[in-house]
UniProtKB/Swiss-Prot annotation:
One Pfam family, short name: YchJ_M-like
Name of this chain's protein: UPF0225 protein XAC4297
Domain of life of the native organism: Bacteria
Organism of origin: Xanthomonas axonopodis pv. citri (strain 306)
InterPro entries: NTF2-like_dom_sf, SEC_C_motif, UPF0225, YchJ-like_M
Family: Belongs to the UPF0225 family.
Lineage: Bacteria, Pseudomonadati, Pseudomonadota, Gammaproteobacteria, Lysobacterales
Gene3D superfamilies the UniProt entry points to: 3.10.450.50
NCBIfam families: PRK04233.1
């Protein structure tokens, strides 16, 4: 988990956290669905439940979000496989995230996420 603004951003882009996902976690609007998805991945790495809930569309947002408070999950990396603009205010992002729980083997998770833009802000809708 990054501890200073100059640490590399967990999302995989070649920038430090302060110039990459940090501004979105502080309230700036993501310019597109892929950027929002990367910021959400970084929020999982940083265990930032407040950002995850705020960036989740109200129609599908859970009442609460329980993250790995014991710190057993180690996020290992993110690969965006494709981004699809499905309409003027909708998009989908397919990505692969890698993580490890405790001392176990690394796990690869592929997700096909849907996003919607409302009032100039992108929101995570759901995944399939």
């Amino acid at each position: 988990m990054p501890t200073t603004p100059t640490d590399p951003c967990p999302c995989g882009r070649p920038a430090d956290y302060a110039r990459c996902c940090g501004p979105y976690h502080a309230g700036a609007a993501a310019p597109d669905a892929e950027t929002l998805m990367r910021a959400r991945y970084s929020a999982y790495v940083r265990r930032d439940a407040a950002y995850l809930l705020a960036s989740w569309h109200p129609s599908t947002r859970p009442a609460a979000l329980s993250l790995d408070e014991g710190g057993r999950t180690t996020w290992l990396g993110l690969t965006v496989q494709r981004t699809l603009d499905t309409g003027p205010e909708t998009a989908e992002v397919v990505f692969l995230a890698r993580y490890r729980i405790g001392g176990g083997s690394a796990v690869r998770m592929t997700e096909h996420s849907r996003f919607v833009r409302e009032a100039g802000h992108w929101f995570y809708l759901d995944a399939r």
